[in-house]
């Protein structure tokens, strides 16, 4: 199946807080719109029509298979984009607007079809009337002179056509016409339907990404659908969360509750909760903020915007340090538990996976560099962790999982909220090693954790020979975010870089058995962890 996606324009100004992005690469719940369409029409050939900021689309879609990005010579109306996309195409095809996600699959419908929804006529959408699938009237984003409070059909932006060559003919004729209030695309659709009537199908699973108010509503609904343990009351703006991982979840709830009053600004407002082991839950205020994870992967922010973000994070990091605890023996036990014991236990769990057998016994090749086996690395860690990390006797309040996905920021980059805290560091609850917080941030900026968990990397591997060759598909940016972050956190990083990198390496090495659903991700994490560890201590052979 051929899928044509017109995406010639950037999103409207009220959605440009992430940058001047075309809709096709705009994020919805931590995934770009194209990712939803790619999975919706799996196995299809895609043609994305671009003009404004086309380079960004080319870069972001370069690692998808069977995707052709076509740049227009000049910007025209919607019909111009579609005409370029279907030129020299014939047979069946799907046209899916770049700002439209519909969970119903039109590909399963025989013949010509289109999806519609209903609303009161307005300038927001294009409305239509049909007679047995023949489009007889179109109101193209124009407010009619007469007041009409009745619901009318509107195009959501998904069409299946059985004869692309005839649509091309209809578009050619429509593009020759002048001074029409109706887009050439819809004039062509009207003419096409005279010969090939549509099955006009109502959908309730339509997410509109093209308008700010609808975008945030769509983001909310997609989030609720994709996470089984989250329910969102849209009317009240309340998110209720449950979890099967009861111990961890209760620790999370208690972290929210134990925060000192003057630090509660960092968390969502809590309305109700239960820490009952049988049915724990928490209901909290829902924020339609983007996560730093989304900004990092999909945003197009300036250096000044990133500086503001990092300064906001630094303020919270520093503010947490107003609350400290000292208990030498208990702190040392917590450090050992979190850094050494946990890593060794995770390695023991990984050993049970036969796919990793050779990695424990044989030298490991990562991008051509030879490292010691994991059995030997284990012995190295038993020496280097106590030497470098057992040197503090004071903890302060920490979040415990301060990765980019757990940090939300408002559209003006002024207010930060943190979610999904760990709630446990050894035998401590809200207290822990502040270097652990920095390592969590490093593992996004330095180790590219966010790219790995979204499969934004290339990898070849040979399990029998313990060989990994991988490359993270990092973003092309005008600013070095790692350097910018280190500059903002200069005082915190100075003198601690190797210790932070050691903890960062341990994060990658200890998370491998937790990602058993993807051997690719596991091996990318292993390669990354060994590369970072080698900066701290020589593990080459």
Predicted regions and their residues:
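Conserved N-terminal catalytic core of the sugar/cofactor nucleotidyltransferase
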Residues: 2-13, 19, 26-95, 177
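Conserved alpha/beta core of the MobA/IspD/sugar-nucleotide pyrophosphorylase nucleotidyltransferase superfamily
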Residues: 3-6, 152-235
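A glycine-centered beta->alpha junction motif in the catalytic cores
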Residues: 9-12, 276-309, 315-325, 353-361, ...
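Conserved core of the sugar-phosphate nucleotidyltransferase
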Residues: 101-178
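ATP-binding glycine-rich loop module of kinase domains
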Residues: 227-258, 285, 292-302
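Conserved kinase catalytic-core helix
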Residues: 259, 295-357, 374-391, 491
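Active-site acidic catalytic loop and adjacent metal/ATP-binding pocket
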Residues: 379-432
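Active-site activation/catalytic loop segments of kinase-like enzymes and analogous catalytic loops
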Residues: 422-488, 505-519
């Amino acid at each position: 199946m051929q899928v044509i996606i017109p995406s010639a324009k950037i999103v409207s100004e009220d959605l440009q807080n992430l940058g001047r992005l075309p809709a096709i690469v705009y994020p919805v719940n931590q995934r770009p719109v194209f990712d939803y369409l790619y999975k919706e029409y799996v196995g299809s050939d895609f043609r994305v029509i671009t003009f404004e900021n086309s380079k960004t689309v080319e870069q972001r879609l370069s690692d998808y298979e069977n995707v052709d990005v076509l740049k227009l010579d000049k910007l025209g109306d919607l019909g111009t984009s579609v005409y370029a996309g279907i030129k020299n195409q014939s047979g069946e095809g799907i046209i899916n607007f770049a700002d439209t996600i519909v969970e119903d699959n039109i590909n399963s419908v025989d013949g010509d079809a289109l999806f519609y929804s209903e609303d009161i006529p307005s300038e927001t959408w294009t409305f239509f009337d049909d007679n047995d699938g023949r489009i007889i009237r179109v109101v193209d984003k124009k407010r009619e002179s007469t007041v009409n409070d009745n619901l009318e059909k509107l195009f959501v932006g998904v069409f299946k056509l059985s004869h692309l060559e005839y649509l091309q003919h209809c578009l050619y004729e429509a593009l020759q016409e002048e001074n029409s209030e109706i887009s050439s695309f819809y004039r062509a659709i009207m003419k096409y339907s005279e010969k090939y009537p549509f099955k006009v199908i109502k959908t309730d699973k339509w997410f509109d990404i093209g308008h700010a108010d609808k975008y945030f509503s769509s983001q909310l609904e997609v989030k609720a659908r994709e996470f089984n343990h989250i329910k969102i009351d849209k009317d009240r703006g309340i998110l209720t969360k449950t979890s099967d991982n009861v111990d961890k979840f209760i620790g999370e709830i208690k972290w929210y509750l134990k925060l000192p009053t003057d630090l509660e600004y960092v968390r969502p407002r809590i309305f109700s909760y239960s820490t009952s082991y049988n049915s724990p839950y928490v209901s909290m205020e829902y924020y339609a903020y983007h996560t730093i994870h989304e900004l990092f992967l999909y945003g197009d922010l300036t250096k000044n915007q990133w500086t503001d973000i990092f300064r906001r994070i630094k303020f919270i990091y520093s503010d947490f340090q107003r609350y400290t605890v000292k208990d030498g023996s208990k702190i040392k036990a917590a450090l050992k538990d979190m850094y050494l014991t946990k890593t060794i236990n995770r390695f023991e769990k990984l050993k049970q996976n036969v796919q990793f057998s050779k990695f424990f016994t044989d030298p490991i090749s990562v991008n051509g560099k030879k490292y010691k086996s994991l059995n030997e690395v284990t012995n190295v860690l038993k020496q280097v962790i106590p030497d470098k990390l057992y040197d503090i006797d004071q903890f302060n309040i920490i979040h415990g999982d301060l990765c980019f996905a757990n940090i939300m920021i408002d559209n003006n980059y002024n207010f930060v909220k943190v979610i999904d805290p760990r709630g446990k560091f050894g035998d401590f609850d809200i207290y822990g090693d502040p270097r652990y917080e920095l390592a969590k941030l490093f593992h996004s900026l330095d180790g590219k954790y966010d790219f790995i968990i979204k499969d934004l990397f290339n990898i070849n591997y040979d399990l029998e020979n313990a060989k990994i060759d991988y490359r993270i598909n990092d973003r092309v940016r005008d600013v070095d975010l790692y350097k910018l972050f280190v500059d903002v956190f200069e005082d915190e990083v100075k003198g601690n870089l190797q210790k932070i990198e050691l903890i960062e390496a341990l994060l990658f090495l200890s998370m491998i058995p937790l990602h058993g659903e993807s051997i690719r991700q596991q091996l990318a994490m292993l390669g990354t962890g060994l590369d970072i560890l080698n900066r701290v201590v020589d593990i080459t052979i």
